[in-house]
From Swiss-Prot:
<keyword id="KW-0449">Lipoprotein</keyword>
<dbReference type="InterPro" id="IPR011990">
    <property type="entry name" value="TPR-like_helical_dom_sf"/>
</dbReference>
<feature type="binding site">
    <location>
        <position position="273"/>
    </location>
    <ligand>
        <name>Ca(2+)</name>
    </ligand>
</feature>
<feature type="signal peptide">
    <location>
        <begin position="1"/>
        <end position="24"/>
    </location>
</feature>
<feature type="binding site">
    <location>
        <begin position="73"/>
        <end position="75"/>
    </location>
    <ligand>
        <name>D-glucose</name>
    </ligand>
</feature>
<comment type="pathway">
    <text>Glycan degradation; starch degradation.</text>
</comment>
<feature type="lipid moiety-binding region" description="N-palmitoyl cysteine">
    <location>
        <position position="25"/>
    </location>
</feature>
<keyword id="KW-0472">Membrane</keyword>
<dbReference type="GO" id="GO:0019867">
    <property type="term" value="C:outer membrane"/>
</dbReference>
<keyword id="KW-0106">Calcium</keyword>
<feature type="binding site">
    <location>
        <position position="432"/>
    </location>
    <ligand>
        <name>Ca(2+)</name>
    </ligand>
</feature>
<comment type="function">
    <text>Major starch-binding protein present at the surface of the cell. Mediates starch-binding before starch transport in the periplasm for degradation.</text>
</comment>
<feature type="binding site">
    <location>
        <position position="430"/>
    </location>
    <ligand>
        <name>Ca(2+)</name>
    </ligand>
</feature>
<keyword id="KW-0732">Signal</keyword>
<feature type="binding site">
    <location>
        <position position="296"/>
    </location>
    <ligand>
        <name>D-glucose</name>
    </ligand>
</feature>
<dbReference type="GO" id="GO:0042802">
    <property type="term" value="F:identical protein binding"/>
</dbReference>
<dbReference type="Pfam" id="PF07980">
    <property type="entry name" value="SusD_RagB"/>
</dbReference>
Amino acid sequence: MKTKYIKQLFSAALIAVLSSGVTSCINDLDISPIDPQTGGSFDQQGVFVKGYAMLGVTGQKGIDGSPDLDGQDEGESGFYRTTFNCNELPTDECLWAWQENQDIPQLTSISWSPSSQRTEWVYVRLGYDITQYNFFLDQTEGMTDAETLRQRAEIRFLRALHYWYFLDLFGKAPFKEHFSNDLPVEKKGTELYTYIQNELNEIEADMYEPRQAPFGRADKAANWLLRARLYLNAGVYTGQTDYAKAEEYASKVIGSAYKLCTNYSELFMADNDENENAMQEIILPIRQDGVKTRNYGGSTYLVCGTRVAGMPRMGTTNGWSCIFARAAMVQKFFSNLEDVPMLPADVEIPTKGLDTDEQIDAFDAEHGIRTEDMIKAAGDDRALLYSGVGGGRRKIQTDAISGFTDGLSIVKWQNYRSDGKPVSHATYPDTDIPLFRLAEAYLTRAEAIFRQGGDATGDINELRKRANCTRKVQTVTEQELIDEWAREFYLEGRRRSDLVRFGMFTTNKYLWDWKGGAMNGTSVASYYNKYPIPVSDINNNRNMSQNEGYK
């Protein structure tokens, strides 16, 4: 029963907020006040679940038609898709095939501006969600029953998480703690960092013990892991590092009831909310269901966006052919790209006889270009890449970004169950998104120990052991660490943050294909380590100032 708790409540939650009279505006974060006497009674359970649902849905009617955010592309404006795009598309992990799409070239080349719409989408989404959290907290102020106290702690956690995204992406936030028409004030750097830290400390006692919460709700381990993430990045956010606390809180998570999943791929399959092996690692998932939570963000984006028609075992009837691996990502598993299993140039792809998964598999197997061949060649179960002929002949790298087969396909996210049973929908995935998982604590502790001059090999090798990696690390280097973050967490919506922390996102310390718009990569101005405050909010909120470097 616990595993389905959040999904069962989603339907009611999707209508709870609008029926309460909440509105939003694309051009600023002004909101209309709620009068519970005219807007209907406060549905505490519905609004509470909506607080979690906003992580994975975009409105009140599923795919589209009644969006949270008026005036925006509903499919593009969800929490996960907007944060994912800003943290993945500019990095060494992936490319977007269709460079003519709005603002995509700017993300690819790290050249965005305050007028970029995709920057505005994530900014407004984070602000909208915080508005809903403030509404819930105002409505439940003074209530002292145990369940309400726990719900309030969880909503405060989600609000702190959103403020962390503001801090990480923008270096500041339009800050409010109450639901009102007052303009948000600017809170940035150390001040915002301290606020998030204090919030997490204050709410910890009222949260579930690790692994005691219904699957999909935040517990103390989620709190500790967000704190570990905050402390690991303290040098970026405040100018003062705090690796000792990062190590301390990562160790608390590792010492809790969570355990590593023994099969890496099962973490990203459609039954990761029922398969105990996967669930034991997933600390906080974004709940997804092919029937109840249909949307164009979330795991639909991750599965459909990485597939093209003709690929074997797509897991969806709708391949969008959008996201593929950069060569730099492939190099995390193959330092020499000549070792990547690829179809020889002199082998023609048959024009007939490749109509079924079985036929494509047979051809791929004959030439050693299946995903299982990739894993074997890499000596690492995490190398979930596809170089076969399903959907066309692929390249490893390209001199012009013109289509989906300009790089290897990433098949990490799947709409297949580990037990072989059917999924709930042929197009929209059931796959939950592990927003927080235990492996992050291992790499956080490894990096924190390394930064303090200690031996970090144990934690890295623990993850490599799980991945059946044939190469164990003997000596940890900074490059080995940043590469390991990619091997473990590629396409999970965090890469930019790691690169910024390592001083590699904008500098020539590390170049990758198409960084800065150059085929072989080039450095960019350091102010791109932060996103700009959207010009719309600068114009509408006199309290907000633009980040340095942007005009």
